[in-house]
Amino acid sequence: QGVDPAGLLAQIQAAFGRECLPLNLPAGGGARVLDCYFNATAPAGEVPDFSSVEQAHQALVEQVVEVDPGFVERYLNDGDVDPRELHAPLEQALREGHLIPVCFVSARNGAGVAELLDVIVRLLPNPAEGNPPEFLKGEGAAAQPLHAEPDAGKHVLAHVFKITQDPYVGKMGIFRIHQGTVTRNSQLYVGDGRKPFKVGHLLVLQGKDHVEVPSAGPGEICAVAKVDEMLFDSVLHDAAEDDHIHLKSLDFPVPVHGIAIEPKRRGDEQRLWDILQKLVDEDPCLRVERVAATN
């Protein structure tokens, strides 16, 4: 209601490129969505709110077959290709950014939510098929690429992508496993640390709930609590010789606004500093400096 889906799609394409194509189209004023990938035509009696299923389907198939010369020839000869045969070129197009799928979803009435989940399960690359993370071993110009394989039997490589301060369990590191299997009894090193920590409680976050699990493998996102050495962008591993492993550094925006603060009561400087450091742990874009002259 009050949304212009055609205009919204046009804005997305203007910002991110013509590779952004809809996998479905809204219908009935946003009451439902119509699949445009597996279906070349709309169901009987259904008309999308803008464009047409035929046009969207044709654009998707043409975009996907462009990455495979064999399918290009078939498409030119036959006029269409069954999308069920395009699993490999579709994944390639997604990995290379040649196709950026757009799915319409309504938070108001839930339209398109089930279809979005179906798209994620059926069409998007799984961890074994997606783009591998850019791990590096070594420092500076001497760093060499390190390929992480989504193999549960290999040694562990995991990346900490978020730090939170939970009011009940304290500092919590959330990480994605890229290689190997982590269990409750795993002994993991944090970066170049020489002393491992025992996982103990391996958690999966489901909303505000923390669900303990016995193990997790490649592609899964888990969390552990009360490991002070764990920081944003840390690499977790279970082999002592796997030192100096890190991911390609991210470019964070430079802060553009600064503010000076001080505690209301004398003697609370250290307490305030500790709180600010916790915020810095959670947000890598935040910078805190302590001016010695003014404390």
Regions of interest found by a model, annotated:
Residues 1-295:
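Structural and coupling elements of P-loop NTPases
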